[in-house]
């Protein structure tokens, strides 16, 4: 063996230190290059326009793609039942797994965004979502739908969902938070408006496989926009959050803790607050009465009454038009009025609409349009007031992760309703009982939101 000189260990240590320093320099230069690109975009925009509005537009498109993906199973239900012979209960099982994981991913996604950054987390989710949807075109067995749509698509869409909206809004906006949250939440309605009639028409003419390929391509198109136009924070482009005073303290640095530890520690602290459980269970009811029941089963329900998939999808799209207006208005109202009172009216009107739904099919002209208008106006209008209440109670720093857990309740409710309504339809041959149960839950939710009291819960959270 060659001899080792006395100076060689020190020389190797120096080489290792030099290589480590060079790697740090390369990373710093890469960050500077990314920030320079963002600064160029800000310079090109110029004037009084705050870059946060452009970043919000990018987030809107992300949520739009996720909404289109989330709405796709409702279009696939009847074609899969006809072509592959799967039962509606089996398809509902896959959808319920998707919905549950969509919600349970939220708090961990919020913690991951704090630890690893918005862009890496979002890009990973979009790639997984696009690949999973494309892979589903080769499904032949119902268990494959559970794995692909339930696991892969459920987790990836959960990352780019309401938790992303809450994280982005708290980072980029000091003023107009309710309005921006309302606009971003309305992306779900816009996704239905853009995707559902088109996807239903494709499914009716060409089958269900081209549908999933179109959705996969739509999700992939958003990826470069995220890579080049979405900064991590306003400070990365030498800006403050929109509307923040000049003397406000700087935002805290990103946490280096394990996202799992952050998510569970936040849950432990928040769960000691009564307000957390009131928000959690009210959002459980929200999910059961929207994504779980109407979002999953309305097209199939219309088919039971002799309507085509395109007609059912068009009804959902019409509801999306009203929801686009209602949710944006809800965001504006949440900046100005008591959010508990807003939630009382939203849940109450939704409950009455769902109780009316089974009777709407028997009214020739005004039945379904009347339901679409009243139900659509507050379909997701509950989100801006809920986010505002969570931020007021738990503070700006903890709000995204806390809201992630509240969204988990939303999606657990949705999964419960998606599976439960499918089982009721399979055993009774009708959705009437499911509509009545869903409407009754909403009226109960309207009552419990009035019990939210910020003072004691804030004190409890701080004491913890």
Mark where each language-model region is:
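Helix-loop-helix hairpin linking two adjacent transmembrane segments in secondary transporters
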Residues: 187-235
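Extracytoplasmic gate region of multi-pass secondary transporters
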Residues: 73-77, 268-327, 417
